[in-house]
Amino acid sequence: MAPTNTKDSDTPGWLHRHGTSVLGSVARQACKQPIYTLVITALLATMTYTSLLEGSLYNANLTRLSNSHLNQLDVTDFLQGSRSLRLGKATAWQWETDDESMSDQEVRPSFFLDPVASHLALITLVFPTSENNPGISAVQESIISDLAAAQLVSRTPSVLSSTFRETSITLSVPYNNLEEVLRKTQNFPQPEAEHSWTLKNAGKCNSGPKLRLWLIDVLASFVGLIKHAQIIDIIIMLLAYLAMHLTFLSLFMSMRQLGSRFWLAYSVLLSGFFSLFFGLKVTTSSGVSTSMITLSECLPILVIIVGFEKPIRLTRAVLRAATESYLPAKPMARRSTPEAIEVAIMREGWRIVRDYAIEIAILAAGATSRVQGALPQFCFLAAWILLFDSLLLFTFYISVLCVKLEITRIRKHVEPRRALEDDDISTGNQDFDSRVFGCKVKAANISRFKFLMVGGFVLFNVLQLSSLTYGNVRVSDWMPYLSNLSNTLMPAPINPYRVARNGLDDIYVASRANNIETRVTVLPPIKYVLQSQSRHCRDNFAGPLCDTLRGRTLGCVLAWLEDPVISKWVIAALFLSLVLNSYLMKAARWNLRQSEVIPDSSATVSQTKDSSNKLAEKRTVDAMLQEGRVSLLEDEEIVNLCLRGKISAHALEKTMERHPTMSRLEAFTRAVKIRRTVVSRTPSTIDVSSSLEYSKAPFENYDYTLVHGACCENIIGYLPLPVGAAGPLVIDGRNYFIPMATTEGVLVASASRGCKAINAGGGAVTVINADGMTRGPCLAFSSVSRAAEAKQWIDSDEGKKILATAFNSTSRFARLQGLKSAQAGTYLYVRFKSTTGDAMGMNMISKGVEKALEVMKGHGFSDMSTISVTGNYCVDKKPAAINWIDGRGKSVVAEALIPADAVRSVLKTDVDALVELNTAKNLVGSAMAGSIGGFNVHASNLVAAVLLATGQDPAQNVESSSCITIMKNVNNNLHISVSMPCIEVGTIGGGTILEPQAAMLDLLGVRGAHATNPGDNARQLARIVAAAVLAGELSTCAALAAGHLVSAHMAHNRSKVAAKTG
């Protein structure tokens, strides 16, 4: 049922199918004409950016400069970003902020319909101070004498005023006199000095916004924002911008892993900027107001949250589809680049669109919410940005990918031919098939393509220049169309309490004392600069002259070219055009060179063709080998490298792991496939191993990442081993199904019959008498007496304590239980015995032994040499009396009492027959043979099956199956027991990490380490092994006693011979 459910769940729905079809159609059209798509998108984005720039920056600067030139001051310029406060009985004599900034009052005159007794304006004049600048005392005297309507109030110093060396003066003036006061404060001449305080940007030559002045203005605005911001806000924004740039870095690193060092990541960022321009255009056209401050604060958060995962996923899918088209399994079915892109969109397109839809829906919900502040406006803008980003991903970025893949393919196919031409070898041109974007082309087509590329970029630059030439002739003509832009990009309102708190306190005291209702408009700080008067006069004179000498068209063009962003974009576009054309011109030149080579005769062409192809292929493969890009070669090429000895077969996993688009599992599976081919084609064994490549030994759908470096080397596949479940069997009061991996028929069935008989008597009972793994190193000394001294020291309490301390320091689970030594001439054998937790423990105890021997050398035995860390005194994987007597691993005894009725009904025999059989066969017969630990029927069968099923070391079956089976007649019932002193199992490490074996451990409930008592899981597994042996011994002895063993094996475990014909 599981496969059916999976299939049903994976079936795409109607929306999925039709959405993917639409995406495929869009991408297909973009891939047919990728250059047109790129140029049109860039042209639209540039036009959008230019309109935004003209409406927000250029026209604003032009208006301000023209007004200053005519000495006409516009109060609305100073009111932008201001805030209005009111005080009176209606506000309970508390300052209340109006909902809208003063910049909106010009648009909505109804704002002033609510009359008040007094309407004041608070002006903060900011002067930079330094050691060379004169003081501002003269400025204060000038204000007192010349501005009768203005009053000095307490200034509010900024937290960062001392850092930036600024001094301010705060004035309170009637709102009706604001324009007059501002006009008189444009310039404060210094008496007996050649300098004067001049209002920033006042009186400059109307020559357009220079780059240096623009940068200074931006820097000053930035500093002003910092001075009036809280420290925590600054820290948060710094962290946001840092995280945003880390996101950019992650994008470049991800694209570099996919094989692109710069261009793909750059294209993703460029697509993001285009989306921002389009989103701003739609937002401004919709009348939604979003300030530049809000953009600068929220855009980093949007970049961090959304990220660039979608373009990376699409790129990875396209590269994978392109790589699959070059697999050796389908040498004649290579996809074109548009086909590879279409396959990638079929796989990932719908998921990407679904993610975009979810994000846009969340932003749309935020845009329609009633949350106070700028969040709804920014959500509206962000939703449009993501919408355009999704459209550009499947048009603009898909075109970039198409061009990138085509250029890579052209270079890959042309490099071998270039190598041949350098050696004066002709390959002919009959079979050369040059395809660009899936269509067959000639050299003339490529030349025409280059012309269109260059012409397209030149055309769009000319159009942009023309649009600007005729666009800024009169600012007033354009203002109705750009009003929305001006509203959108206007400065954010200031915080009046940070700018003029002390001045507001003075007004509050006066108004409350006189009981006068008051409205106060707090203007943003007005900056002043110190200028030379002579230079100021020259600038005033040069203004009209500049306008006269230069035409309006030329001024607009120069102003546009001086813009810091547009100029960079023009340079970037021209550079991109140059790079693309360089690639295409090289491809066209190589193609033309190839067509100019005329073969002398058909015989020469045919003879040269094969040899030249082989030579070119060999050179290309060798070059990629030297560059460390073997994983990008085809399988057949890698096989040839292995057979030539250029690549070691055992290192294929490490080599394939470097593939940029393959997962680690896919790379390892590919390595196994290649190694099978190498083994099959190795010349020295090809007569016997040639069948492996196409044999039925499986190698796919297996997790080789778990095997690599842990379980096996030189992997050529895996062998499915049948696994049966015997039982259930009650062991110490709990039911278990016992997994057995075996190819011997009747074994699982026999064990299941034994389980049934044991359950009839209440189940099996197990006990563990000992738990300790052993390791016996061999030590050599210069003389027998030195070996004896070492033996005495090891057997002493002091020696045991020192060795135990050193041994136990190597692991938190290893605890030395005992030492046993034996001397043979100058050789000394020491048997370490230690607990090892839930691990089988061979590696753990070996590490402890090495540490103990190292410490022993420092206690008077520096002349000792270690022959081997294992001296066969352990004893490991060999039958030995010492294991039978002292035990190794888990020493387990299991017993069961079988009722006489169950013996007759289930086992088909009687108690006395079983007792006599066991005595004669298992005890006397094994003694006659001189067996060590072999006093059983077939304990090794059961032990090996359980060890294989649970991921144990199968070789440990040699000592683990040491067993003595005892049967007794107790009150006409059968009492059976098995004693097994050397069960060596673990539940962590080794083969237990493999998924199938781990699943069998889960079946027994003993997977991994025990959570509270280390070692309990491994001991429980040893109990289960002993109980399984108990069931197997019981059933097989019964079959022997009843004479059923041979007939059962003949019926279930004998190969059927094919019938003879003819």
UniProtKB/Swiss-Prot annotation:
First-tier enzyme category under EC: oxidoreductase
Residues carrying sugar: 61, 484
Entry binding sites for CoA: 750-756, 906-908, 1048-1049
Disulphide linkage map: none
EC number in record: 1.1.1.34
Active site: 744 (charge relay system), 877 (charge relay system), 953 (charge relay system), 1049 (proton donor)
GO-annotated molecular function: hydroxymethylglutaryl-CoA reductase (NADPH) activity
Entry keywords, A to Z: Endoplasmic reticulum, Glycoprotein, Lipid biosynthesis, Lipid metabolism, Membrane, NADP, Oxidoreductase, Steroid biosynthesis, Steroid metabolism, Sterol biosynthesis, Sterol metabolism, Transmembrane, Transmembrane helix
Any GO BP: ergosterol biosynthetic process
Pathway: Metabolic intermediate biosynthesis; (R)-mevalonate biosynthesis; (R)-mevalonate from acetyl-CoA: step 3/3
Record membrane topology: Multi-pass membrane protein
InterPro entries reported for this sequence: HMG-CoA_N_dom (IPR025583), HMG_CoA_Rdtase (IPR002202), HMG_CoA_Rdtase_cat_sf (IPR023074), HMG_CoA_Rdtase_CS (IPR023076), HMG_CoA_Rdtase_eu_arc (IPR004554), HMG_CoA_Rdtase_N (IPR023282), HMG_CoA_Rdtase_NAD(P)-bd_sf (IPR009023), HMG_CoA_Rdtase_sub-bd_dom_sf (IPR009029)
Pfam families: HMG-CoA_red, HPIH, Sterol-sensing
Stored SUPFAM superfamilies: NAD-binding domain of HMG-CoA reductase, Substrate-binding domain of HMG-CoA reductase
Chief place where the protein resides: endoplasmic reticulum
Gene3D superfamilies xref list: 3-hydroxy-3-methylglutaryl-coenzyme A Reductase, Chain A, domain 2, HMGR, N-terminal domain, Hydroxymethylglutaryl-CoA reductase, class I/II, NAD/NADP-binding domain
Positions annotated to bind NADP(+): 811-813, 838-846, 1053-1054
Cellular compartment(s): Endoplasmic reticulum membrane
Parts of the chain on the Lumenal side: 56-230, 283-287, 376-377, 472-564
Enzymatic reactions: (R)-mevalonate + 2 NADP(+) + CoA = (3S)-3-hydroxy-3-methylglutaryl-CoA + 2 NADPH + 2 H(+)
Domain SSD: residue ranges: 233-403
PANTHER family: 3-HYDROXY-3-METHYLGLUTARYL-COENZYME A REDUCTASE
Family per similarity comment: Belongs to the HMG-CoA reductase family.
Function per UniProt: HMG-CoA reductase; part of the first module of ergosterol biosynthesis pathway that includes the early steps of the pathway, conserved across all eukaryotes, and which results in the formation of mevalonate from acetyl-coenzyme A (acetyl-CoA). Hmg1 and hmg2 catalyze the reduction of hydroxymethylglutaryl-CoA (HMG-CoA) to mevalonate. The first module starts with the action of the cytosolic acetyl-CoA acetyltransferase erg10B that catalyzes the formation of acetoacetyl-CoA. The hydroxymethylglutaryl-CoA synthases erg13A and erg13B then condense acetyl-CoA with acetoacetyl-CoA to form HMG-CoA.
NCBIfam families assigned: HMG_CoA_R_NADP
UniProt name for this protein: 3-hydroxy-3-methylglutaryl-coenzyme A reductase 2
Gene encoding the protein: hmg2
